[in-house]
Amino acid sequence: MSKFLQQKPIILASSSTIRHKLMKSLGLDFLVVPSNCNEEEIKTRHNSDELVKLGITLAKIKALDVSQHYPEHYIIAADQLCIADKRVFNKPLNHQTAVSHLRELSGKQHQQIACLCIVKESKILWQYHETATLTLHHLSEKTIEAYLQAEKPYQSCGAYQYEGLGKWLFKEVQGSEDTILGLPLMPLVNALVNLKVVGI
């Protein structure tokens, strides 16, 4: 960490390499300790009419799970939901599901909702969500297949990597890139300063 910033101990409760890079871009020192909570089980039990609440709930559960083992740290946790027509598009995990997701999203508008939470000593200090709205081009089968072979975005909600070649799939985007990537930086920066986790 540079001398410009003074900070308290921070943990990022996420295994996402993109969130790791975004946090690093802020010049912070932090540990990475992913949560062991069962996301799929929580999603299955949740009411589909309260999707933003689901994202916030997942972020809180992740942060609280890690906080019980690291009470001296401020825990930052996040969750990302890709939603179209009140349906959540989870990570496809394989090629066949990714093809299906891109077919369904082709030519349509969908939302990427980034949910954040900061916890210390098992107390929730801050929670936040931000939405980006994206519209894909009408994608041919050839385009879908070529894109998936090029990037294999099977660990990405929506079956695309916006930080890479995925940008070429879109005709309109409303919202910040870091929201699409799952970690809205300016709200997080302001929260860390307001909570006196980071000082300048």
Swiss-Prot record:
Catalytic activity field: a ribonucleoside 5'-triphosphate + H2O = a ribonucleoside 5'-phosphate + diphosphate + H(+); a 2'-deoxyribonucleoside 5'-triphosphate + H2O = a 2'-deoxyribonucleoside 5'-phosphate + diphosphate + H(+)
Top-rank taxon, per record: Bacteria
Family note: Belongs to the Maf family.
EC numbers: 3.6.1.9
Key words, A-Z: Cytoplasm, Hydrolase, Nucleotide metabolism
Names of the cofactor(s): a divalent metal cation
CC terms in the record's Gene Ontology section: cytoplasm
Pfam family, one: Maf
Cellular location(s): Cytoplasm
Organism taxonomic ancestry: Bacteria, Pseudomonadati, Pseudomonadota, Gammaproteobacteria, Legionellales
Keyword field contains Cytoplasm: yes
Enzyme class, UniProt record, top EC level: hydrolase
Gene Ontology terms describing biological process: nucleotide metabolic process
Species name: Legionella pneumophila (strain Lens)
Function: Nucleoside triphosphate pyrophosphatase. May have a dual role in cell division arrest and in preventing the incorporation of modified nucleotides into cellular nucleic acids.
Protein name as it appears in the record: Nucleoside triphosphate pyrophosphatase
GO MF annotation, one: nucleoside triphosphate diphosphatase activity
Major location (coarse): cytoplasm
